[in-house]
Amino acid sequence: MTNRWQRTDMPRGEEYDSRWHTLAEAGENIHGEADLVESLLAESGCTNVLDAGCGTGRVAIELAKRGVGVTGVDADAGMLGTARIKAPEIDWYEADLSDPTGIPNGTFDLILLAGNVMIFLEPGTEDRVLANMASRLTEGGLLVAGFSLRPGQLTCDRYDELTAAAGLAQVARWATWDRIPYTGGDYAVTVVCR
């Protein structure tokens, strides 16, 4: 398994954003992640979010528009550059998610790993990333991750093992960001709690 994000053919910055603009112009809801996060925050009384692997800031910016306190972190300087241009009022940090010193100090009520972050990680760092995320959650805080399930990539069973090892307990698993029950398939959204 190789680090998919390091491939040179991966769209970055504005090119990455153009896909989302096209979908929005076609009438698609491109804010499913923000919709779910907003509802989870309302249900739990949580207030602050870390968008880990935030890319160009699509989800973080939408959450901020909805009044959510949000911080973004990503390892890709180009993607963050686009995010900073679009929303300079949000705190954006360049950091490797497996490095505990790279993420801003403090804890978060909810940490989001959207956009297939888990399958774009450097292979073999998933355990460190999840342990790092767990250490940044408030007691009772939620970690929400959505990623594709394809042969040769991270499975739900392996993800469950890794989150349990990080001291996190599963709360829910859905097939989509709009809470359609997971019954198998090629995508899962999993919520775990500290």
Residue ranges and their predicted role:
Residues 1-53:
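Conserved class I S-adenosyl-L-methionine
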Residues 140-147:
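Conserved beta-strand signature within the Rossmann-like core of class I S-adenosyl-L-methionine
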Residues 109-124:
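A short SAM/SAH-binding and catalytic strip from SAM-dependent methyltransferases
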Residues 155, 168-194:
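Class I S-adenosyl-L-methionine
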